[in-house]
């Protein structure tokens, strides 16, 4: 099964999407889903003494402006594993530039976790948590000599727009 092409983007898009975990929370290993091999591969180990602040992965059947599937971060208390599918509620969007390309990231919470039942928008997340996530993406590639830039957070409505946009880009490229 191709976890990118064979799974719907979610059960109730854009309000609820599937996140296919590539990198568990707390990991320094950067795994990527290799679309052609249909397997997870170790892309690299982070050069810095930092770790992923949330579950990190992709939304199936999406394509974003950087030519890759739409990235998604899912806030969790405990890490899962590569390949885990999390039914997720988008709550925000981190605007970001990576290597000159727009590389925004959806921030979401797991539908099945009662700790996040009342979280509907990034305004429901402590400001410091958002700063930690943005700081990770501002610094995690510095020792590789690569530049990333975060441009700020937007709320759930912008996240929904980004999800719909990425589904449309995928549809135009692969389904027409």
Swiss-Prot record:
<feature type="binding site">
    <location>
        <position position="44"/>
    </location>
    <ligand>
        <name>substrate</name>
    </ligand>
</feature>
<feature type="binding site">
    <location>
        <position position="71"/>
    </location>
    <ligand>
        <name>Mg(2+) 1</name>
    </ligand>
</feature>
<feature type="binding site">
    <location>
        <position position="71"/>
    </location>
    <ligand>
        <name>Mg(2+) 2</name>
    </ligand>
</feature>
<feature type="binding site">
    <location>
        <position position="56"/>
    </location>
    <ligand>
        <name>substrate</name>
    </ligand>
</feature>
<dbReference type="Pfam" id="PF00719">
    <property type="entry name" value="Pyrophosphatase"/>
</dbReference>
<keyword id="KW-0963">Cytoplasm</keyword>
<comment type="function">
    <text>Catalyzes the hydrolysis of inorganic pyrophosphate (PPi) forming two phosphate ions.</text>
</comment>
<keyword id="KW-0460">Magnesium</keyword>
<dbReference type="InterPro" id="IPR036649">
    <property type="entry name" value="Pyrophosphatase_sf"/>
</dbReference>
<protein>
    <recommendedName>
        <fullName>Inorganic pyrophosphatase</fullName>
        <ecNumber>3.6.1.1</ecNumber>
    </recommendedName>
</protein>
<dbReference type="GO" id="GO:0000287">
    <property type="term" value="F:magnesium ion binding"/>
</dbReference>
<feature type="binding site">
    <location>
        <position position="30"/>
    </location>
    <ligand>
        <name>substrate</name>
    </ligand>
</feature>
<dbReference type="GO" id="GO:0005737">
    <property type="term" value="C:cytoplasm"/>
</dbReference>
<comment type="subunit">
    <text>Homohexamer.</text>
</comment>
<keyword id="KW-0378">Hydrolase</keyword>
<dbReference type="GO" id="GO:0004427">
    <property type="term" value="F:inorganic diphosphate phosphatase activity"/>
</dbReference>
<feature type="binding site">
    <location>
        <position position="103"/>
    </location>
    <ligand>
        <name>Mg(2+) 1</name>
    </ligand>
</feature>
<dbReference type="InterPro" id="IPR008162">
    <property type="entry name" value="Pyrophosphatase"/>
</dbReference>
<dbReference type="GO" id="GO:0006796">
    <property type="term" value="P:phosphate-containing compound metabolic process"/>
</dbReference>
<comment type="similarity">
    <text>Belongs to the PPase family.</text>
</comment>
<feature type="binding site">
    <location>
        <position position="140"/>
    </location>
    <ligand>
        <name>substrate</name>
    </ligand>
</feature>
<feature type="binding site">
    <location>
        <position position="66"/>
    </location>
    <ligand>
        <name>Mg(2+) 1</name>
    </ligand>
</feature>
<keyword id="KW-0479">Metal-binding</keyword>
């Amino acid at each position: 099964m191709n976890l990118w092409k064979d799974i719907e983007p979610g059960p109730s898009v854009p309000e609820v999407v599937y996140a296919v975990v590539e990198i568990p929370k707390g990991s320094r290993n950067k795994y990527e889903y290799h679309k052609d091999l249909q397997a997870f591969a170790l892309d690299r180990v982070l050069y810095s003494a930092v770790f992923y602040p949330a579950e990190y992965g992709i939304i199936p059947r999406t394509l974003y402006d950087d030519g890759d599937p739409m990235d998604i971060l899912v806030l969790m208390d405990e890490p899962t594993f590569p390949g885990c599918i999390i039914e997720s509620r988008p709550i925000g969007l981190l605007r970001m530039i990576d290597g000159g390309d727009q590389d925004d990231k959806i921030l979401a919470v797991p539908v099945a976790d009662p700790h996040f039942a009342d979280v509907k928008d990034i305004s429901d997340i402590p400001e410091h948590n958002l700063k930690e996530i943005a700081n990770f993406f501002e610094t995690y590639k510095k020792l590789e000599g690569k530049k990333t830039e975060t441009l700020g957070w937007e709320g759930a409505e912008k996240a929904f727009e980004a999800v719909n946009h990425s589904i449309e880009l995928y549809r135009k490229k692969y389904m027409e």
